[in-house]
Amino acid sequence: MPQVSIVVPIYNVERYLSYCLDTLRAQTLRDIEIICVNDGSPDHSAAIAEAHASLDKRIRVINKPNGGLSSARNAGINAARGDYLMFVDSDDYLAEEACESVVSAFESNNADIVTFGAHCVPQKSNNDWLDCVLSPRDRVYREFTEDLLFAESSRPFAWRTAVRKQFIDAHELRFDESVPFGEDQVFHFDIYPLARTTALISDKLYYYRLSRKDSLMSTFANSSKWRVPKHIDIVGAILTHWDERGLMDLCPVRLMDWILDFLCYDLFRLSIDQQKECLAKLGSILESHFEDAVTTANTIFPVMGDIVRTSIELANGSRHDIPRSLARNYTRFRIGLLAMVRDWLRRLFSKDEEGHVEDELENLTERLESEEALGNSLVKLIAQTKSQAYLPQVNNTRSAR
């Protein structure tokens, strides 16, 4: 049996596939299998995969009708014989030491999950958020805590997360084929809470090719009108899975905060009619899965409670409009807070390694206390940060959205 099974979904990638497979065949760890899943690709991708398979017996080609990325990955998972699973999109590629480094992390930590860093191709993404999430720090979680999902650079791309095959089989974990976009986000919310040990490593082992102009990702990135309903579908799938597994009591406030942050910036850029439609759909989902969605959101900040209350009232038909102040208050809260923290981080990171971090934390606390509306939630956050003796490292630690 191979140590690593690499699942490569294939669809319309004839331009990139040969290079991708060459990097997999060149891995320094030789004990691998490469499972190419041809998802009904109409171009010459299947023939390219078969040609590589004729040169390397470690390559297997599975042909199936088109079913989407999740369907292709699941077919690869079901066929895999290795101890560990990795996922590589067929227009991307791996560093030659990737499999060896991942296996080392699994075995040295007895981990169920290993998440690693990635480079963008070309190197400059011009996207601070993307650079952040592709740069995890070195850290091992021996049990699940909410920070793994919400404070680490641990999401949302499945291709930079490897899993122990026995772990996902034992928990019957697969990609959700009902989610046509954002399945990686759902997958991470599924796997992290169930893992005994998760290892994050800062090594950048994957090369992520930035989206082509004609790709689904490009359409997604450039259209809030298209993106928000898809994001709501992602939230619905995550909450459904958590409800089914009895996980909703793990971290309801942190989960709600992430959901609203995930959705609201784009949502309030839509037309009023689109906002009402999306908020009503969101309200129905939140009311179905949270014991008291409004109270949970209000714990974060009052405007968050207002957003959830409005969404639920739109969903059940008890209101038909959106308060004019809702978007304005949300923007003041989020954008004002971000500007304040960004200023603090810039000053903090401009210092040398012996900078007065404690002083900076105290200064920020004082500023937040002067903003009466922000004080309760954010001063508490700084106190927690200090008590955990953890501050972001300049080079490789950032928060994932």
Give the label of every model feature segment:
Residues 1-25:
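N-proximal low-complexity "stem/linker" segments adjacent to membrane-targeting elements
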Residues 2-5, 33, 186:
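Cell-envelope/extracellular polymer assembly enzymes that use nucleotide-activated donors
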Residues 23, 38-48, 65:
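A conserved acidic beta->alpha catalytic loop
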Residues 31-40, 60-65, 89-90:
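Short beta-strand/loop segment that forms part of the nucleotide-sugar
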Residues 64-80:
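Glycine-rich, basic loop-to-helix element that forms the pyrophosphate-binding segment
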Residues 69, 90-226, 232-233, 246, ...:
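Donor-binding/catalytic cores of nucleotide-activated saccharide
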Residues 85:
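Short aromatic/hydrophobic "clamp" motif used to bind/position activated sugar donors
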Residues 269-401:
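Membrane-interface aromatic/basic loop that binds lipid-linked glycans or pyrophosphate carriers
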